[in-house]
Amino acid sequence: MPTTTQIQAWAERLRHAEATATPIAPLREEITDNDSAYAVQLVNVQYAQSQGRRIVGRKIGLTSLAVQKQLGVDQPDFGTLFADMLYGDDEAVPLSRTLQPKVEAEVALVLAKDLERPDTTLVDVISATAYVLPAIEIVGSRIADWNIRFIDTVADNASSGLVVLGAVPTALNALDLKLCQMQMTRNGDVVSTGSGGACLGHPLNAAVWLARRLANLGQPLRAGDLVLTGALGPMVAVNAGDRFEARISGIGSVCAQFEG
């Protein structure tokens, strides 16, 4: 197990990469186990909190087989969302806020109840969900050229960047999320398609996985938390001036407009 000093040093390296907009070499040659990678992530989450940033939820990453194939990984991970990451529908998003940005369309849940049990069930998640929103997650990597494997993205807060949320909530009981179809356009051209079934078979399966994982860590999901359940299709690179629109059947649409 790495020493506390080593964990702190890896975490600082990632912070420096973000602060200087200079991606770094992969960390997987130095961080050799998943627990250590999550320890690095936690150090930077705690550092962010010490700087006044407010946690508003969690994201689940690597739930789509298409995204897993793109990145060469084979299991989900999770990261932390902060209030200053969130943008509203069609709000201008500065491109400079994210290193090597890419976008993916997702289903977002907002919780009405805590999910504290390590044996959380699908029924528990359904009961705890206040509503769903369409979302565009803007992922970013502090690792050069997106040359990542599981350990790299975990340490890097699951490659979190920003989130653009739709503004019209939909009740879960009005939806079959597995059958929801997603289409995302960039400047009017279709660039990504998928469905709810691409997200661990069902977006709520991803939420169950996350609730159990966090409960076991003593960091359970709480009422009011935002949960990004994972990509519904392949992620797409972003350029200055791009406008993305994601439409998810039954849930609605959300737009992300990028400034230079």
Swiss-Prot record:
Pathway: Aromatic compound metabolism; 3-phenylpropanoate degradation. It comes from the Bacteria. Its EC number is 4.2.1.80. It catalyses: (S)-4-hydroxy-2-oxopentanoate = (2Z)-2-hydroxypenta-2,4-dienoate + H2O. GO terms for biological process: 3-phenylpropionate catabolic process. SUPFAM superfamilies: FAH. Belongs to the hydratase/decarboxylase family. MhpD subfamily. NCBIfam families: PRK11342.1 (NF008461). This is 2-keto-4-pentenoate hydratase. It comes from Comamonas testosteroni (Pseudomonas testosteroni).
